[in-house]
Amino acid sequence: MKTKNLMTLLLAAIVALQFNNGLIAQEMNKMWGEQSAGNTEVKRGRFFDWGNYAMFIHWGLYSQLANKWDGATYYGNSEWIMNKNMAGIPLDEYKAVAKSFNPDKFDAKQFAQLAKDAGMKYIIITSKHHDGFAMYHSQCNKFNIVDATPFKRDPMKELSEACKELGLGFGFYYSHNQDWTYPGGTSGPKVDHEGNPKTFDDYFVEKCLPQVEEITKNYGEIELIWFDTPGRMPKQYAKQLVEVVHRNQPRALVSGRVGFGLGDYRTFGDMEVPLENVEGLWEGVDVTNDSWGFAWYDQNWKTPKQILGYLIATIARGGTYMLNVGPDPSGQIPEMAQISLRTAGEWIARYPQVIYSAESSPWKHALPWGDVVVNDGKIYLAVFDWSSYGKLYLPGLKSEITSVKLLTGNKSQKLNFTREGNLTIINTPCPKPEKLVSVIEVSIKGDIEVDNTLFVDPELGLKISTKFSTPENCNVKYKGWLEKYGEWKHIYQIGDWNDKSSTTWNFEIMTPGRYFVELTATGTGNRVWNVMTDEGFEIQNRQNTSSIYHTQPIGWVNFKTAGKHSLTVRIPEGERANTSLAEIKLTPFE
């Protein structure tokens, strides 16, 4: 769990009483001032640990192109369109795009208000991405939005002021290693315009370091600086940048992507939510659609329920969630992104205790119907799959329960419950009370004690990663890949199969009987899957696989008794070597 102090608990109380009024920001600033006045060690990240939710904005010269160049559309992250892996735009031609970049519909107050309406607590925006173009008025390099474009305004100054007015934190993304247009920057030209050789040290001294000084001195108080892609840059440069940030902004965090373990917190891979709890300060970063910067074709927007799903899952694993939007060439955030964000924000306004100052789940992983967070000693069940039979099964809670309540905004309804062995069975009303995510508050006596054994829900079954299995003569490994350029997918999978390999899941079932088994896998050719229970019930099925993960039916197994059981998967025949097994799913017979 994240470490919470007295200040955080006080903030939680303020949120509960004053969520929809501007006193939150005032109280936070007051308490931070009091804390730092009496403490020589300044606490960093005012909003990061408490707020749990932030807006990321990828906006730059690439937004003008919107993934089109020379009549062709390039699919992937728009901020990479200049790169050789996409359009491979020559440096001078890319820089010339600045002459037509005029996002005249940009309104900083609208950006900040959207973040506030969405329930986000701070904004991080690209001050300079890999293309080297500065989205603020840089004094050390003319390739910036004020000096090189007809826009002639500093949107970062306007946005920092709008955030301050609305009580939001503000900070910058800065690409410290890659600079594709400045001589000496990684992946940039090796010589200047006069043909003189340039090194990374030249780039660092002439542009990178001065610009980090600018963004940490000229825009008021900063929540954090989000560096990116350190690559093979020497550690000494990253160390110097961290020192600059901490000197100029004592309360600001430095992201883990500065490299070399020098950051104040850990940043996971793009679009990645861990499957198990992670200790310490960390964040997950994600997109509202597929591309970070604006792409004309990209309409694959996350729904409000999907946004809440990723947000709550990140908090339940112990992290902070930062969700990206990409303004269009006119400087406006796409309408569908706004709709999803505001709708999710309306839900957050009804259930702030599920988000702000919330801590990780004692179960340490998701449950079949949703996820769990803890706030001020109370357990909050975020139920995504509401029971159609009027029962919610909460496994493994050992603590004495004093009350169970269904929350509906500012109202609550007492729910009856029973305890059966390792299960708490909560009687729930039909239909589901919330369109998006329903919330049940469980109050307990004393400390929270949990047996986090996997549980096969009598109604929903269980879908679980191989990360939670025990392999023998094979290995569970993390796997990440690009679905298309810039769009990451993440799984854990079992590979390195041979004729002696197996993997076993341990879990608990409440209802004896038959369960349908499905496996999610990839590979080439055919293989035979063998599935056996701890009671000796065995099924076997031959299936073909493909280069993409898909779910395959295997058959029915039978568990004769309730309680703790295990299920083991083997490949007795067929193409083993290139097989990747990602998940197993058990569905109860109805």
Tell me what each language-model feature is.
Residues 1-27:
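Bacterial Sec-dependent N-terminal signal peptides
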Residues 26-511, 518-521, 525-559, 564-590:
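Mature catalytic domains of secreted/periplasmic carbohydrate-active enzymes
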